[in-house]
């Protein structure tokens, strides 16, 4: 799996960074792509990447602020002409999302050539799709804002070739049956497939947060995440300001990483007051502290393998 950032700025775009948009490539579990938030200009950012809109079959919106949704109408209409014809799309997000999209399309006399299924969240939400389990929890941002927890499918254990050879079964087409079914038959005897496979490997857990100040529900979303994507609008000494505006300070994120046992944190939604040089300098200063957890400040077009 891969995650790519098409926008990493908070509130307003800058010369270096666009507003919020994240793409999650589900391979090898699926050939689909999921988008999380679609800030203004997202479709233009995607033109600089190999991602195709026709492969996007789910869009998740964290909240209804403009820097997270103003790119939606244009991206949806462009999808009609970029491989999305007749390919269903599911759009998930807070109440009002369907009205925003349909009103914009109606007033602009725009027409889509594919169906959209809308799912609007009210406080808490659980969704299952092709082995993935997605849950959404309400955060604290003044308006309804959600964090998404994505639990990937479990990968079956690898075949124990030596164990199969011990019963006289050598590499061949029968091995696919061992991989795919609970039981298999060999020379008149039925065997349990699990006895000839290594332990199953849990898929990665990814948590993606909308804008929020610290709140209890963050722990449920982030717990044991292999990758957590979190906002830190304020990364210097502006903690009171972060709290007043229902945002997170970098120290808040560090505390969550430790409490939730997060393996890796990718920090986005940085205030537009910071340029690339500022961010790198602050990062170097933070890395000098012994108790700083594993984190990265991300920039537009960064891609990370999960």
Curated annotation (Swiss-Prot):
The record's comment on cofactor binding reads: Binds 2 Zn(2+) ions.
Q: Which GO terms describe its molecular function?
A: 3'-tRNA processing endoribonuclease activity; zinc ion binding
Q: Which Pfam families match?
A: Lactamase_B_2
Keywords of the record, alphabetical order, are:
Endonuclease, Hydrolase, Metal-binding, Nuclease, tRNA processing, Zinc
Q: Does Transcription count among this protein's keywords?
A: no
Q: Where is the active site?
A: 67
InterPro entries to which the protein is assigned, alphabetical: Metallo-B-lactamas, RibonucZ/Hydroxyglut_hydro, RNase_Z/BN
Which residues of this UniProt protein bind Zn(2+) 1? 63, 65, 141, 211
Give the protein's function: Zinc phosphodiesterase, which displays some tRNA 3'-processing endonuclease activity. Probably involved in tRNA maturation, by removing a 3'-trailer from precursor tRNA.
Q: How does it assemble?
A: Homodimer.
What family is it from?
Belongs to the RNase Z family.
Q: What is this protein called?
A: Ribonuclease Z
Organismal lineage: Bacteria, Bacillati, Bacillota, Bacilli, Bacillales
State the encoding gene: rnz
């Amino acid at each position: 799996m891969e995650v790519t950032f098409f926008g990493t700025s908070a509130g307003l775009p800058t010369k270096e960074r666009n507003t919020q948009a994240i793409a999650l490539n589900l391979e090898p579990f699926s050939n689909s792509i999921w988008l999380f938030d679609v800030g203004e200009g997202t479709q233009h950012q995607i033109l600089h990447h190999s991602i195709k809109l026709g492969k996007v079959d789910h869009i998740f919106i964290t909240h209804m602020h403009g820097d997270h949704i103003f790119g939606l109408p244009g991206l949806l209409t462009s999808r009609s002409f970029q491989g999305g014809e007749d390919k269903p799309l599911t759009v998930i997000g807070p109440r009002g999302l369907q009205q925003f999209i349909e009103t914009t399309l109606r007033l602009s006399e725009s027409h889509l050539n594919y169906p959209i299924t809308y799912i609007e969240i009210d406080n808490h939400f659980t969704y299952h799709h092709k082995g993935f389990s997605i849950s959404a929890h309400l955060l604290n941002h003044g308006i309804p804002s959600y964090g998404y927890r994505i639990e990937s499918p479990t990968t079956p254990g690898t075949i124990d070739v030596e164990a199969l050879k011990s019963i006289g079964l050598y590499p061949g087409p029968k091995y696919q049956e061992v991989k795919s079914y609970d039981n298999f038959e060999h020379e008149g005897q039925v065997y349990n497939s699990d006895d000839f496979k290594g332990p199953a490997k849990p898929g990665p857990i990814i948590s993606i947060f909308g804008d929020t100040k610290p709140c209890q529900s963050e722990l449920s979303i982030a717990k044991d995440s292999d990758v957590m994507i979190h906002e830190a609008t304020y990364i210097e000494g502006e903690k009171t300001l972060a709290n007043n505006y229902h945002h997170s300070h970098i120290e808040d994120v560090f505390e969550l990483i430790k409490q939730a046992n997060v393996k890796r944190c990718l920090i986005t939604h940085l205030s537009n007051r910071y340029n690339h040089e500022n961010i790198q300098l602050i990062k170097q200063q933070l890395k000098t502290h012994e108790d700083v957890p594993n984190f990265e400040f991300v920039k537009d077009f960064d891609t990370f393998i999960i």
